[in-house]
Every structure is written in C-alpha cells, then in structure tokens.
From Swiss-Prot:
Its EC number is 4.1.1.19. The record marks 75-76 as: Cleavage (non-hydrolytic). Keywords: Autocatalytic cleavage, Decarboxylase, Lyase, Polyamine biosynthesis, Pyruvate, Schiff base, Zymogen. This is Arginine decarboxylase proenzyme. It comes from Sulfurisphaera tokodaii (strain DSM 16993 / JCM 10545 / NBRC 100140 / 7) (Sulfolobus tokodaii). Transmembrane segments: none annotated. The active site is at residues 76, 81, 96. Gene3D superfamilies: S-adenosylmethionine decarboxylase. GO terms for cellular component: cytosol. Is synthesized initially as an inactive proenzyme. Formation of the active enzyme involves a self-maturation process in which the active site pyruvoyl group is generated from an internal serine residue via an autocatalytic post-translational modification. Two non-identical subunits are generated from the proenzyme in this reaction, and the pyruvate is formed at the N-terminus of the alpha chain, which is derived from the carboxyl end of the proenzyme. The lineage of its organism: Archaea, Thermoproteota, Thermoprotei, Sulfolobales, Sulfolobaceae. GO terms for biological process: arginine catabolic process; polyamine biosynthetic process. Its cofactor is pyruvate. The modification Pyruvic acid (Ser) is found at residue 76. Pathway: Amine and polyamine biosynthesis; agmatine biosynthesis; agmatine from L-arginine: step 1/1.
Length: 128
C-alpha cells in the first residue's frame, strides 16, 4: 500500500497533512521495546524532514501493556502507541510543514515494525 496518497489532493491550500493508521500482527517483543521504538520515531522525524522539538516515550503496564512514543515537531507531531497483548499499534503522523512528508515517516515506521497487515489513511486538514 505505497500509493502516493498526498498527490491525490490539491496541494494549493493544504495547511495540514495527516497520515494515520493501524498496524496488525507485529512481533510483541518489538512492541514492548521502548528504546527501539523511541529511536524509530526519531529516525522517522528525520526521514520526513521535520524539526524535532521534544520526544517522550514510556512503557505502560497492565494486562495489555505496550509503549507510547510522542514526538513533538515544529510542524506538529508523530505518535506511536502499541499494545503487546493484541500485537497491534496505531500510528499518527501530522504536519503543517510545506516541506515535510508525513507519508515517508509512516512508511518508514511500518517497514521497521513489519506488521503482517496495516491500514493507512490520509486526511487533508486544510482551511477549506
């Protein structure tokens, strides 16, 4: 699913580009590796040509377990949340930067997590 979603919309008035999705059947060891996921999101920031402001990551316990990683970038954010019990993750990449590429960040993270299947969506977050 590597279609160029962003190219399907009129880019003259785009204020925000939002690529998000669900990733299924991922190795649970990866989904609980906070350091790996933290570094993965850091690299995605670079690949998408975004400017990092701050990044936070944390494990959460309980029955479902998992990790959350949030990168605050000048252009907006990248958020990755995992659930080890379900071998599942959600990924949200939003940018209002003209030169940043949220789809590149999304596809890079997917390539490293290697889900058996995933869904990718695009939302044009423009003013009109």
């Amino acid at each position: 699913m590597s279609s160029q979603l962003i190219s399907l919309v009129n880019t003259d008035r785009i204020i925000g580009k939002h690529v998000f999705g669900n990733l299924y059947d991922i190795d649970p060891k990866i989904l609980n590796d906070k350091d790996f996921l933290h570094n993965l999101v850091l690299e995605a920031v670079k690949i998408a040509n975004m400017k990092l402001v701050e990044i936070k990551s944390w494990n959460f316990g309980g029955k479902k377990g998992g990790v959350s990683v949030i990168a605050l970038v000048e252009e907006s954010h990248i958020a990755l949340h995992t659930w080890t019990e379900y071998n599942y993750a959600t990924l949200d990449v939003y940018t209002c930067g003209e030169n940043s590429n949220p789809q590149a960040a999304f596809e890079y993270i997917v390539s490293q997590l290697k889900p058996k299947r995933y869904q990718m969506f695009y939302a044009d977050r423009s003013s009109e």
